[in-house]
């Protein structure tokens, strides 16, 4: 099974290391680990490579989070991918920092990036990898997800990226349930 991994985030250096950009962070880790470089397309950056006979495409939308769904007509056409190849990597404030959750389907909840994707695709039946960023009720949700990780939190997030960069490239139609068990039971 070919795999289209789309990490959500906001473009621009001012969003680097913010909670909302963990999807971008994981894509950057995968690019670095596999000695790739991102190429720019109309409204996204991408890298593609093969593992054995499987094609892996890594995507960072450049549309800002709330418009992430706008890239899919272009991406599916360019890379000959379908919704069953899709894995979206996204932050989740309902999960503690360092916890991850892999799902085959799901709703958008309060996440505008997922809502945009689901509306664009006309479906919620696509894979999601949620990366827990914690929550702090002292902040408005928007302010919290746009806040940067402190140094100790950033160490934990990098440990999550290291772990996930080993796990997610092996996801296929035969291993998805096993990967769910492995990823969902991890915590950093």
Curated annotation (Swiss-Prot):
The keyword tRNA-binding applies. One of its GO terms (molecular function) is peptidyl-tRNA hydrolase activity. It comes from the Bacteria. It catalyses: an N-acyl-L-alpha-aminoacyl-tRNA + H2O = an N-acyl-L-amino acid + a tRNA + H(+). TRNA binds at residues 15, 64, 66, 112. The record marks 91 as: Stabilizes the basic form of H active site to accept a proton. Keywords: Cytoplasm, Hydrolase, RNA-binding, tRNA-binding. GO terms for cellular component: cytoplasm. InterPro entries: Pept_tRNA_hydro, Pept_tRNA_hydro_CS, Pept_tRNA_hydro_sf. Its EC number is 3.1.1.29. The active site is at 20 (proton acceptor). The record marks 10 as: Discriminates between blocked and unblocked aminoacyl-tRNA. One of its GO terms (biological process) is rescue of stalled ribosome. It is found in: Cytoplasm. Belongs to the PTH family. PANTHER family: PEPTIDYL-TRNA HYDROLASE. NCBIfam families: pth. Monomer. Hydrolyzes ribosome-free peptidyl-tRNAs (with 1 or more amino acids incorporated), which drop off the ribosome during protein synthesis, or as a result of ribosome stalling. Catalyzes the release of premature peptidyl moieties from peptidyl-tRNA molecules trapped in stalled 50S ribosomal subunits, and thus maintains levels of free tRNAs and 50S ribosomes. This is Peptidyl-tRNA hydrolase. It comes from Borrelia duttonii (strain Ly). The lineage of its organism: Bacteria, Pseudomonadati, Spirochaetota, Spirochaetia, Spirochaetales.
């Amino acid at each position: 099974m070919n795999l289209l991994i789309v990490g959500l985030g906001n473009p621009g250096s001012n969003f680097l290391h913010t909670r909302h950009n963990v999807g971008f962070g994981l894509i950057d880790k995968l690019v670095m680990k596999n000695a790739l470089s991102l190429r720019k397309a109309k409204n996204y950056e991408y890298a593609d490579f093969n593992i054995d006979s499987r094609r892996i495409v890594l995507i960072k939308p450049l549309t800002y989070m709330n418009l992430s769904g706008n890239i899919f007509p272009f991406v599916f056409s360019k890379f000959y991918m379908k919704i069953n190849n899709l894995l979206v990597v996204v932050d989740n404030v309902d999960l503690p920092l360092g916890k991850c959750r892999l799902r085959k389907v799901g709703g958008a909840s309060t996440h505008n990036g997922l809502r945009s994707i689901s509306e664009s695709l006309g479906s919620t039946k696509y894979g999601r990898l949620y990366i827990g960023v914690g929550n702090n009720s002292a902040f408005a949700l928007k302010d919290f997800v746009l806040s940067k990780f402190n140094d100790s939190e950033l160490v934990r997030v990098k440990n999550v990226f290291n772990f996930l960069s080993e796990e997610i490239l092996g996801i296929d139609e035969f291993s998805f349930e096993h990967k769910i068990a492995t990823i969902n039971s991890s915590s950093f």
